[in-house]
Amino acid sequence: VSVLMSEIIAHHLKDQAEIKIYDPTSGSGSLLINIGTSVAKHVKDNNKIKYYAQELKENTYNLTRMNLVMRGILPSNIVARNADTLEDDWPYFEENDPINTYEPLYVDAVVSNPPYSQAWDSKNKESDPRYARFGLAPTTKADYAFLLHDLYHLTPDGIMAIVLPHGVLFRGGEEERIRKNLIENNHIDTIIGLPA
């Protein structure tokens, strides 16, 4: 699956001089590594690829950083965070002046394989810019919360690939409203169903 996702993203980004890639549920970093390898075939300078990773579990967060460096990626091209993606969005700010230097992270490609149908706390998230436009995923299933987080962090010409359970295509309620809104706003290009 990661090879297919990587090739689709690399094809979309092939003419860009500088590329930012983000995995908000990076695990060991394998998706970032595969995408970076595919994108590197199309760029003149591999050092123009910047990798952003966020991971909840500290041990796998450390694996992400280690695996990227072991693949020859310069530490200066790796920005990794140990945090909860749905609770702690990734703004950029300078530590000594967070209020005046705040800006959200926008990237050329987002790739993720978030935990399936995980419960999440949507309390006080109605005005969160990641969800305000399309709605809140149900508290019992965070699949669309992850998807909307990913979508929010894309540049206007960016591309996203996310692995989700088939249920996101058929479930009703708030998920149906989010799905309909995404389709009506032309935010879904392709869905690839794979056997279990």
Model-derived segments and spans:
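Conserved S-adenosyl-L-methionine
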Residues: 2-109, 117, 128-130, 145, 187-196, ...
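Short, flexible active-site loops
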Residues: 131-134, 160-167, 193
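Glycine-rich S-adenosyl-L-methionine
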Residues: 130-154
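Conserved ATPase-coupling elements of RecA-like P-loop NTPase cores
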Residues: 119-124
